[in-house]
């Protein structure tokens, strides 16, 4: 049904108005637009992970980008699905000398950072990237029959915009350090959980305030060692889905590492979720 190709960021062309009067329509689009990657989540593993589970195994093509400004009504026009795996923050002044999100630096023992001449001293600060018009664009896209798959830390984006939060259905409250926990199926009758068993991952166990009806929940994350996070206990919502206007929404919380995205049971969930939000047979 769909071509079996992906482009990492053919969307970069969309940013250049010189290419066409309407850059959002300048190139032939894939089935899904994916905004992925942030300071703490390398876009490469997300692209590799979802290219396998969604494009190669389902035949659903994806245009990937990490450019947040491309999430807008003009870009979304013509896509059938939206996928997001990233947080809501940008760091315009850098990281203030903290390179702990750089895996190679950490793996080599965090050597002293030396620069000659010295780097300018700039204080690190984060800011939300989502603008009101972007949240509105996402809401209108899904209401008009678009499919939305939100993964892992996307709940953090909800903190910046009420329209986006209304679509996603919850907002991030935090997570403990990476640890092992179980993902439990709480609604075995849901189309997305068909053929899926409980499974275990080593991941960030994300906690959030869930805004919608409990009947839409189909996954729960559980730390079976009894480890908690702040006052939130050892369990958290792990996945939910619902119709939204003429479209559909699904959120699932695992996804901090490639090993999580490629857990065999989680692959089943991704397959079922994409089919469900796009109204294909599950």
Model-derived segments and spans:
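Aromatic-Pro/Gly-enriched surface loop or interdomain linker
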Residues: 25-81, 85-88, 104-105
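Solvent-exposed loop/turn segments at secondary-structure junctions
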Residues: 38-41, 69-70, 88-91, 154-158, ...
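A conditional alpha-helix N-cap/helix-loop micro-motif detector
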Residues: 43, 72, 128-131, 233
């Amino acid at each position: 049904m769909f071509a079996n190709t992906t482009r990492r960021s053919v969307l970069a062309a969309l940013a250049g108005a010189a290419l066409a009067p309407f850059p959002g329509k300048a190139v032939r689009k894939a089935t899904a637009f994916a905004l992925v990657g942030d300071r703490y989540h390398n876009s490469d593993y997300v692209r590799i992970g979802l290219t396998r589970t969604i494009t190669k195994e389902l035949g659903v093509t994806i245009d990937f980008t990490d450019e947040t400004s491309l999430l807008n009504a003009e870009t979304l026009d013509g896509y059938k699905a939206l996928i997001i795996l990233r947080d809501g923050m940008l760091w315009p002044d850098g990281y203030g000398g903290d390179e702990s999100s750089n895996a190679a630096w950490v793996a080599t023992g965090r050597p002293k950072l030396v620069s000659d001449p010295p780097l300018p001293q700039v204080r690190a600060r984060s800011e939300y990237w989502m603008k009101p018009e972007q949240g509105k664009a996402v809401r209108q896209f899904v209401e008009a029959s678009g499919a939305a798959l939100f993964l892992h830390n996307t709940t953090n984006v909800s903190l910046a915009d009420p329209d986006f939060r209304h679509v996603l259905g919850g907002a991030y409250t935090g997570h403990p350090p990476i640890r092992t926990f179980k993902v439990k199926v709480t609604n075995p009758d849901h189309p997305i959980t068909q053929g899926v068993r409980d499974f275990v991952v080593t991941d960030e166990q994300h906690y959030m305030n869930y805004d919608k009806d409990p009947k839409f929940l189909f996954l729960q994350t559980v730390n079976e060692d009894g480890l908690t996070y702040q006052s939130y206990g050892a369990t958290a919502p792990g996945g939910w889905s619902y119709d939204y206007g003429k479209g559909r929404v699904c959120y699932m919380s695992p996804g901090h590492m490639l090993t999580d995205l490629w857990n065999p049971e989680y692959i089943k969930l991704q397959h079922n979720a994409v089919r469900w939000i796009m109204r294909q047979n599950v």
